[in-house]
Structure formats: structure tokens, C-alpha cells
Amino acid sequence: FKRYAVELPRVPLPRDLPATTAPAVAVLAGTADVSPTELDLPQLSRLLHLSAGVVRTTERPYATWFFRAAGSAGGRFPLEVYVAVPDGLGLPAGLHWYDPLDHALVQVGPQPRGHAPALVVTGVPWRTGWRYRERGYRHVYWDAGTMLSQLLAAADSAGLAPRLHTRFPDAAVA
């Protein structure tokens, strides 16, 4: 798991996740009848857990195995999730990294421009590249597709109306 070398402000996320009554098949088919809602801290916690979190652990005499919500080619887990938080949501405004092991947000940057929260999925190619060489980039993209589909389904099932942006606005961020 990724770790930041310095102590940064951390916000533990709620572990009591809100439930949904939407059938999974209806959510995936786009036919679920779910009342629209706004993103709040419990829903954000649910989205992060169901898309990038540790959902189960197994203890062995030689190691502890962590099972993540989204599968990963070869178990390399090259993706990181960041949450851009303007004022609100019960969190300090800023850019936060999701720590899946502790189910917490770590503030790594200042308050973003804009008025809506955003989840940003980034890839760390060397995590797959050292094993899969030139095919490593493909595995990052496959993993991103898996995680994003779970994230969108979890958001849809909660009535959050997510939007996926696949073109990063480099000029706006620079």
C-alpha cells in the first residue's frame, strides 16, 4: 500500500456504510429506480470502500492477505484514488488521497477550484510494468476500467448521478 513519508492530516471515514435497496442487476442495466441524493460523507465513504477499499483480510502464518473491492491484473493494484473536496462534506477543503488500508482520507493538497467534489483515479504504471513490461500500461487501463465501473455502479445505486470525465484538463490544472 502507498504511504506518504510525512505526517499529513488524516480523516477517518465512517465504517457504517449506508445501504441501498436498488437491485444490482437494475443498477448495471441502468433501469434502477433510485431517488436522487447529494453526496455526503457517509456516501463518499461507501463509494471509496466499494470501489477501492479493502473488503476482506485473511490471516496466514506467513502473511496477511488484503482483498480489495476492485480486482487487479496480477494483484498489482496500480491505481490510487484522490478526492478533491471544496468546502463541505464534513471534510477539510483540499485534495485528499484515499488510504484503503485504514479507510481514511489524507490531505495532500490545498482546496481545489470549483464547487463540486470530484474523485480522481490515477495510475502508477511501474507497479505493473516491472512484472508485465510493455504490457503494463494495458493492465493499468484494465484495472482503471474495473474500478471506474464499480465506482459508477455504487454511485448510481445511491442516486448520486455520477459523471465520468476521461479527458484530463491539463491546461486548467497547470
Give the positions of each predicted feature.
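N-terminal accessory segments that position/regulate proteins before the catalytic core
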Residues: F1-A174
